[in-house]
């Protein structure tokens, strides 16, 4: 299963930037595990988006864990919206990632 995570900053950008290095290190770990396929900030910079691949049988538990362990969430500078996603067009391309 795929999912989109919309990250919205809850604090001023200067507060968010204090935790950006640890947030990016966390995301690199998810990428190495094959969970994170792509990520990046929104423009203008008021949050970001993650494209995730999670096991069908543990999707909600995995998504909750991803959210709860993100340093942005742990330090209270951002919140997540999690959207399980049923990919139609392009699914075969994502499956190759």
Label the model's feature ranges.
Residues 1-97:
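Conserved, structured core segments of small domains
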